[in-house]
Amino acid sequence: MDDSQTPANPYAAGAAYVQGRFVPVGQASISVLDWGFTRSDVTYDVVHVTGDAFFRLDDHLDRFARSMAKRRLAPAEDRARMTEILHRVVSLAGLREAYVAMLALRGRPRIGGSRRPVDCDNHFIAYALPWIDVVPPEVQARGAHLWIGSGERVPDAAFDPTVKNYMWGDLNSSLMEAHDHGYDTSVLCDGQGRVTEGPGFNIFVVKDGRVLTPAHGSLQGITRRSVLELCEELGLPCAVADIPRATLEDADEVFLATTAGGVMPVSRVGPVAGGQRIMGNDRPGVVSVRLKELYWAKHRAGWYATPVRHDVMA
């Protein structure tokens, strides 16, 4: 019997691969001198598992490879080995529904005091946790309340937003601001007043029958891509475009998209003149619900599914 199937599975809370070993996620650690920690010199990606299968695993690995190349990160593990590790951490944890992360970190300098990135040994970490929803299911059911942060998103010219990263100072500030005002989560605009993204998700606006998602300042999300494909399948006009803040404030519907939760409807947006914008009778909108239902129905039918391999042992 595999460890993941025993009653006392030490990996039940999650499994990790770090420093070349598989360990319970609570035992995973890195050096406090790792530049991934001290300088956020790290890129990562997250893929989900549902029904014992990865969703769009190859697409996530492709994006992870692009991010590593842009950040000049080259861990020892090649793509084939990384794939094996991802399967193994899910299997060890015994999870059929999981949040699975892969990280490439700069590492610590081999030469004490060096400030040269090339003096660091890059390394790879992966872990699997029980399913995570960025927006809790009960909040999705009534529609999330979305706060437009008072700060600005880091400009594209300062850091490429298509590289998934942990430099979340601006996003976390907006999230705390949202919570201070009684909202569930937040989104930021850029210096030109265009809508960008939120902490861990892309945003979509439905206006006059068109489904729009920002062209700038945001990650090219895999769930975002999936939603655009679903719009085409349903015959819904959709576009990647600049979205002024005013369009968000006057939207017919708004929803969020992320690996950790899928399609997540919004029912309120604020602050706007007069307080807040309440959409769809303060409930998830018709288009949002239609896309959410189709997204999960296609999951159940095996859409872009890669079954978890439980025979990977190393």
Region roles according to the model:
Residues 1-76, 84-88, 113-314:
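Helix-start/capping segments and mature chain N-termini
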